[in-house]
Design a protein with these regions (language model features):
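Conserved beta-propeller blade repeats
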Residues: 1, 23-40, 74-95, 115-140, ...
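A flexible loop/linker signature enriched in serine peptidases of the S9 family
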Residues: 1-7, 22-24, 40-59, 70-77, ...
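Short coil turn/linker residues within repeat-based beta-strand modules
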Residues: 15-17, 64-66, 112-113, 157, ...
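Serine-hydrolase catalytic core recognition
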Residues: 88, 210-322
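Helix-coil-helix junctions within alpha-helical repeat/solenoid scaffolds
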Residues: 133-135, 140-164
Length: 322
């Protein structure tokens, strides 16, 4: 269940003054107006107001310093809730999760918690809402082989496939009124694709060095994301009508090679790793790091503690066990 404890402070952006504090494990503040907002409270040690044993979570409305539980009554133990809103702040978008392999997409009118209901999922696969566009919900679903697909669902529950399941893992996707931008994982490295809302590919972007793309967001017209790799702390990109543009970047000094490395385990399974070394150097020593658990892959991240090893002629090997 975890033992995290904390608080959330809410600040006035003009004055910088704190005007409210949420005690406990709270997340996903979603504003209704200047004075009212929803938030998700996680219960780790005590029962919920409706008497369900922890761990679980509930959605509350905060109004004038007073809390009212507005969603989640009866959600069982070991089920968690997360919450957001559609791009134009009209719809509430929620996920009810059970473990690492099952979730349900929930949505409804932002101002009316009584309208929040399941729109997809609930079986033994992950599903989460992306947005509400052109009168339909877009949902990411990981049924089938679990690679990920994007579905369009109307208010009657009719389902159409926008992006079908391929051979790459869907890591994230967001939408504007005209386009979808998705992140896929290929050999533990990210590529970025842009499609129209009918699922036609507009363009695709990979990177000179294998890396990880995260923090995908939009202002309603352009898309923004962060890229990082073993020797690159960050690069921030904007993807708009004029293509992909680099906004800011930082790289570790020096020239390095990042290559894919494949090994065969005792039972015949092929295991992928990244081999990082200084360009032109034949390593005489190496540090191998690996992890496997909770279906979490090890994708390229900036690893400053490996830089001295690389500068000293060594190699850094990053093994993917999931």
């Amino acid at each position: 269940a975890g033992s995290d404890k904390g608080y959330t402070d809410l600040m006035d952006t003009d004055s910088g003054e704190q005007f409210d504090r949420l005690e406990g494990v709270t997340n996903d503040v979603t504003w209704l107006d200047d004075d009212r907002f929803y938030y998700v409270r996680s219960y780790r040690e005590t029962a919920t107001p409706d008497g369900v044993k922890p761990p679980t979570s509930r959605v509350f409305l905060r109004d004038g310093g007073q809390d009212e539980m507005v969603y989640g009554s009866g959600v069982p133990t070991s089920h968690g809730l997360s919450m957001g809103e559609s791009l134009h702040s009209e719809k509430a978008l929620l996920v009810m999760s059970y473990g690492w392999h099952r979730s349900t997409a929930i949505a409804g009118e932002l101002a009316s918690p009584d309208s929040w209901e399941k729109i997809y999922g609930g079986n033994d696969f992950l599903a989460y809402p992306i947005d509400r566009v052109r009168g339909k919900y877009l949902v990411a679903s990981f049924e089938g082989n679990g690679w990920g697909q994007v579905l369009s669902i109307d208010d009657a529950g009719s389902v159409e496939t926008v992006l079908g399941e391929g051979k790459e893992v869907l890591q994230g996707v967001i939408s504007t009124a005209d386009n979808l931008v998705s992140i896929y994982m290929v050999d533990a490295s990210s590529i970025v694709r842009r499609h129209d809302l009918e699922g036609h590919l507009i363009d695709e972007f990979d990177f000179e060095a294998p890396g990880s793309v995260s923090s995908l967001t939009t202002d309603g017209s352009d898309f923004f994301f962060k890229y990082q790799s073993f020797t690159t702390p960050h690069r921030v990109y904007r993807l708009g009508e004029d293509g992909l543009n680099l906004l800011t970047s930082e790289d570790a000094p020096g020239d390095f090679d990042i290559n894919d490395l494949w090994s065969t385990s005792k039972d015949g399974t092929r295991v992928h790793s990244f081999l990082v070394k200084k360009k032109g150097v034949k390593p005489v020593k190496a540090l191998l790091y690996g992890y496997g658990g909770f279906s979490i892959p090890l994708t390229p991240v900036y690893f400053p503690s490996a830089i001295p090893l690389l500068e000293d002629g060594g190699a850094f090997i990053y093994a993917n066990l999931r």
